[in-house]
């Protein structure tokens, strides 16, 4: 018999290394030939979109197009340490370091422009679209390209650093401020359980994710789709089949991850509530996007068949067995 | 060693291959076509997908000598920066790329689908790429990209 | 604030290179004079070992076989230095690295691996974390398998349960899973034009890898260079060291480019896994559905090595309440060594597991109270100004209620009715 159920899951997630451990990101910004700007940072692009998002933060701070920014993050010889691409920390932590570095860079450009334009102070100078100019007398203007030519090539640079704030917890009570900031979300699913085969099919899903502010909404959606799929695999079928320390499912013909046939278009809602300590309000969402999905599925399974599943994964065999036991128990009660 | 001739991305090649060499090794190591990716070596993940005589194959499961006389398309032959293919463009525009490791195989699976069925439904698209695993995207933007490419190509 | 770039769907900067197949991942790099490396790994979960490489060394084309004797400082690890670069006396899990063969090609590497003689003196293993916590359990490292114990003590849970109208108690179990990123580990090492040991890999944290390589080889960090190629997914599985030190050691000793590409099967052995948790939950609420107390005991199996176990189980503990205000909380979370594959970071890092428990507890409490699942959450959820179980004040950006309300609206969940969903 096919039974339909619905369920919800909520979660919160503290980002960053946390617990008072120094969480430091550093970035360097340099003027390049042709008036381009290089951002040098050890933040890794693992596929999540760090390269794009961090470039956007730099471009926003310098008020210039992303095309004119060269993002260098591959080689330890050229880039300062920006911490790990983990703990959902790159957008917030390294994004902040880049914003600070770009602000310092902007001030440096103003100082240099003041000299070259023979001005008395930097007040009224604006940095925008690859040039430094006096707001109320725009004829006083110097392009990034001209400034590069006037400098001894490549020595105009600035650095920035961001150190996140957390408080180590007390050992006996756990009292402290272990993470900052926290990200929140909610996921609702509707699914169908085939009580004979134990197969679970998701029919509908709605996923609302707090992001502080979305630097790039498409990339946020990509994380939500990906997190949903990973959670689906986690709860319903991924299994190493571990026996006495041996991974028996050690290849993709045995360790099954979701395919395009297992996933579905989900309704994604991006909730914005900017965080004041974050770069343009943006919080990390890489990990959170997987978290509320699993419990929503489990609650929906209960709603469908009245059986609580307390052990993962909910494979068809385990589900059929649980249904049979439940029926037996009900029979005994009667 | 065996001598084989085949056409890859429009170019004819005559190559000496070992008996136990796989097509993926020939493409990657003899011809430098590293857009062909290896994810599982057992035909499950589809990262090594190429189009051989119009059919999608996992190049890790095809022996090099079996490609004798065939015509093969890899991602490098589909389009490049100057001459990008509409499916590639759709993947960029829709945001269907994350880590990018499944992307070449995914795009070629889409190409083979659209060559045969220019107007697939969402279900048909999902089925056509179900032999290509992706761990990042949850597939939805990939499906959307193929759907968009189909409109452009029609 | 007027924003011009932030908030825009700027096209992914690395997309063009990825759709054209030009993006290079570590296995896509080839160099003149390049040789290959392959790792010998333990076939048993717990044993003392003796290794004899002499027969393999005589094979034509074998350049060198590295073992623990060749590593100046044979230790590494993200928090505790409990991993050995190559096991010296004991293997603690199936897949532990024992030796690294460098040979002229891959086939010779395979042949050499078959000819390395490993004598395993097997010892009893422990695979269940609850068993592993007992005093008489076989010890994986040192004299206790308990790596870490995290505690939260807030209010008085006994009092909280006494005042509760409903109490729900359950034990939940999650399992060990793999990141299954699509690109198996690979890398290429060489000495660059300035004499630096250079390693091209796919890593989440290049500066950390550099630090570990420098430490293992006992050389200065500026003599080591990490180049991060394109990365075929990570999800936490590329935080610990896998092949980085092996590659660096080989290039350093041999002064020739060395390449390693893992198979999918080896990838499963090489990197960390998600911690399986056993979560014992007791949650109480008053008759209006207000949560009064939570007591949770969480036991995490970190397998043969600690990796991020302390931080993961800490994160489980801190997130054990779920996003709800609870006045009385007692949490104990433990990380425990076993002879299973080692667990480390994976997307959500201990916070992915606990909602499997707390969200089902919420639904069960609601059912007992004859309340719907949305209402009980609305009554207890974090809002701006809420205080967490660790005493942290959530001063801003807490739009959980909005998240819930928008999902409720789109799912058309009934609210305020005595039924689930």
Report each predicted region and the residues it spans:
Chain A
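Cofactor-binding beta-sheet edge motifs in enzyme active sites
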Residues: 1-334
């Amino acid at each position: 018999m096919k039974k339909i159920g619905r369920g919800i899951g909520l979660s919160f997630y503290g980002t960053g290394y946390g617990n008072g451990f120094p969480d430091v990101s550093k970035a360097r910004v340099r003027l390049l030939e042709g008036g381009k700007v290089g951002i040098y940072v050890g933040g890794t692009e693992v596929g999540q979109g760090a390269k794009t998002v961090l470039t956007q933060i730099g471009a926003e701070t310098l008020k210039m197009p992303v095309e004119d920014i060269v993002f260098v993050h591959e080689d330890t010889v050229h880039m300062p340490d920006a911490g790990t691409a983990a703990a959902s920390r790159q957008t917030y932590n390294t994004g902040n370091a880049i914003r600070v570095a770009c602000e310092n860079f902007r001030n440096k450009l103003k100082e240099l422009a003041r000299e070259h334009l023979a001005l008395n102070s930097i007040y009224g100078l604006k940095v925008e679209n690859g040039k430094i100019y006096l707001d109320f007398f725009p004829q006083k203007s110097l392009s990034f390209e001209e400034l590069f030519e006037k400098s001894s090539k490549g020595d105009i640079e600035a650095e920035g650093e961001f150190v996140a704030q957390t408080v180590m917890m007390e050992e006996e009570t756990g009292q402290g401020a272990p993470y900052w900031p926290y990200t929140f979300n909610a996921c609702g699913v509707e699914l169908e359980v085939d009580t004979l085969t134990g197969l679970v099919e998701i029919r509908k899903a709605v996923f609302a994710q707090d992001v502080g502010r979305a630097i790039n909404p498409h990339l946020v959606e990509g994380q939500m789709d990906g997190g949903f799929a990973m959670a689906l695999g986690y709860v319903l079928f991924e299994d190493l089949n571990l026996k006495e320390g041996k991974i028996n499912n050690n290849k993709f013909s045995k360790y099954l991850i979701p395919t395009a046939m297992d996933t579905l278009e989900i309704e994604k809602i991006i909730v914005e509530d900017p965080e004041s300590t974050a770069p343009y309000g943006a919080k990390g969402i890489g990990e959170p996007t997987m978290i509320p999905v699993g419990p929503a599925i489990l609650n929906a399974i209960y709603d469908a068949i009245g059986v609580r599943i307390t052990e993962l994964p909910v494979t068809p065999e385990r589900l059929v067995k649980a249904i049979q036991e439940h029926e037996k128990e009900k029979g005994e009660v009667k | 060693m065996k001598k084989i001739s085949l056409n890859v991305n429009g170019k004819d090649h005559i190559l000496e291959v070992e008996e136990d060499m796989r097509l993926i090794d020939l493409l990657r190591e003899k011809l430098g076509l590293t857009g062909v990716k290896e994810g599982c070596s057992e035909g499950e993940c589809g990262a090594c997908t190429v189009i051989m005589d119009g059919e999608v194959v996992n190049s890790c499961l095809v022996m090099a000598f079996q490609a004798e006389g065939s015509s093969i398309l890899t991602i490098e032959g589909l389009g490049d920066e100057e001459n990008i293919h509409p499916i590639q463009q759709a993947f960029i525009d829709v945001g269907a790329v994350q880590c990018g490791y499944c992307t070449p195989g995914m795009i070629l699976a889409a190409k083979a689908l659209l060559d045969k069925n220019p107007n697939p439904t969402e279900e048909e698209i999902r089925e056509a790429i179900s032999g290509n695993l992706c761990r990042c995207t949850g597939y939805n933007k990939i499906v959307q990209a193929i759907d968009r490419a189909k409109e452009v190509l029609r | 604030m007027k924003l011009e770039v932030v908030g825009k769907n700027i096209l992914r900067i690395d997309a063009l290179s990825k759709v054209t197949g030009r993006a290079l991942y570590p296995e896509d790099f080839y160099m003149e004079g390049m040789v290959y490396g392959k790792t010998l790994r333990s076939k048993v979960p717990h044993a003392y070992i003796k290794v004899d490489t002499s027969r393999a060394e005589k094979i034509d084309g074998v350049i060198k076989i590295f073992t623990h004797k060749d590593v100046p400082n044979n230790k590494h690890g993200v928090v505790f230095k409990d991993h050995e670069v190559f096991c010296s006396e004991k293997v603690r899990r199936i897949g532990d690295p024992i030796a690294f063969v460098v040979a002229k090609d891959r086939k010779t590497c395979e042949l050499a691996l078959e000819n390395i003689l490993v004598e395993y003196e097997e010892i009893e293993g422990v695979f269940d974390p609850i068993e592993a916590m007992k005093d008489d359990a076989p010890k994986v490292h040192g004299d206790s398998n308990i790596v870490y114990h995290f505690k939260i003590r807030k209010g008085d849970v006994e009092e909280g349960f006494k005042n509760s109208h409903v109490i729900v108690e359950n034990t939940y179990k999650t399992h060990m899973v793999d990141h299954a990123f699509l690109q198996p580990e690979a890398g290429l090492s060489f000495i660059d034009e300035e004499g630096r040991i250079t390693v091209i890999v796919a890593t989440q944290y290049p500066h950390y890898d550099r630090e570990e390589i420098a430490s293992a080889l006992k050389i200065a960090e500026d003599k080591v260079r990490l180049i991060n190629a394109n990365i075929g997914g990570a999800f936490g599985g590329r935080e610990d060291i896998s092949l980085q030190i092996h590659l660096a050691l080989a290039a350093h000793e041999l002064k020739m480019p060395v390449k390693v590409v893992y198979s999918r099967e080896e990838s499963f052995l090489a990197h960390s896994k998600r911690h399986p948790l056993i979560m014992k939950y007791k949650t109480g609420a008053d008759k209006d559905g207000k949560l009064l107390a939570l007591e949770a005991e969480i036991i995490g199996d970190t397998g043969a090595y600690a990796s991020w176990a302390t931080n993961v189980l800490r994160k489980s503990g801190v997130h054990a309440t779920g996003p709800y205000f609870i006045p009385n909380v007692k949490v104990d979370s433990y990380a425990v060594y076993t002879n299973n594959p080692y667990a480390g970071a994976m997307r959500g890092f201990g916070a992915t597991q606990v909602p499997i428990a707390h969200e089902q507890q919420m639904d069960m409490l609601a059912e007992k109270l004859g309340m719907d699942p949305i209402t009980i959450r609305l009554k207890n959820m974090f809002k701006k100004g809420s205080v967490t179980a660790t005493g942290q004040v959530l001063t801003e950006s807490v739009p959980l209620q909005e998240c819930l309300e928008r999902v409720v609206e789109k799912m058309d969940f009934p609210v305020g009715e005595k039924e689930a969903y």
